[in-house]
Amino acid sequence: MISVNDFRTGLTITVDNDLWQVIEFQHVKPGKGAAFVRSKLRNLRTGAIQEKTFRAGEKVEKAHIENRRMQYLYASGEAHVFMDNGTYEQIELSEAQIERELKFLKENMEVSIMTYQGEVLGVELPNTVELKVVETEPGIKGDTASNVTKPATLETGLVVQVPIFINEGEMLVINTAEGKYVSRA
């Protein structure tokens, strides 16, 4: 059990027999009445986001999530195959389970698979990934007013806004949390 006063971003808890990850939280001490913790939680099974308020000092069950380092091997129809590098055990995840992460996954990429009591919850990506530009408009010389961007399609199908000087074939560093361009690789 953990007190809601000890909440931190990324903490995984069990509330109403469901797994939730704390996205945001705020301790509120009103001038009148008891203190409370206002939180925004993401359901790890469905992806739904819910705002929930807890009384200060209230206890919730902490969920012990296991993270396994795995390698993304390939897509086979609707299934995506991952392999544990230590045991060579392979697991398949459906497109629905990793819909958001698919935009960043490349073959042979190392990721962390989150599991809870043997149930696969999802894929945790690295903070940044390197992806190749497969399609973008050529930059026009002299068209540099200020922070000019253009759309670029990357090798995974993800479309991001990039500076005008980026060309096809270049490797870019992309932030996986926001899906935005960071720099050239």
Curated annotation (Swiss-Prot):
CDD domains: S1_EF-P_repeat_1, S1_EF-P_repeat_2. GO terms for molecular function: translation elongation factor activity. SMART domains: EFP, Elong-fact-P_C. Keywords: Cytoplasm, Elongation factor, Protein biosynthesis. SUPFAM superfamilies: Nucleic acid-binding proteins, Translation proteins SH3-like domain. The keyword Protein biosynthesis applies. One of its GO terms (biological process) is peptide biosynthetic process. GO terms for cellular component: cytoplasm. Pathway: Protein biosynthesis; polypeptide chain elongation. It is found in: Cytoplasm. InterPro entries: Elong-fact-P_C, NA-bd_OB-fold, Rib_uL2_dom2, Transl_elong_fac_P/YeiP, Transl_elong_KOW-like, Transl_elong_P/YeiP_cen, Transl_elong_P/YeiP_CS, Transl_elongation_fac_P. Its main location: cytoplasm. PANTHER family: ELONGATION FACTOR P, ELONGATION FACTOR P (EF-P) FAMILY PROTEIN. Involved in peptide bond synthesis. Stimulates efficient translation and peptide-bond synthesis on native or reconstituted 70S ribosomes in vitro. Probably functions indirectly by altering the affinity of the ribosome for aminoacyl-tRNA, thus increasing their reactivity as acceptors for peptidyl transferase. Belongs to the elongation factor P family. This is Elongation factor P. It comes from Bacillus cytotoxicus (strain DSM 22905 / CIP 110041 / 391-98 / NVH 391-98).
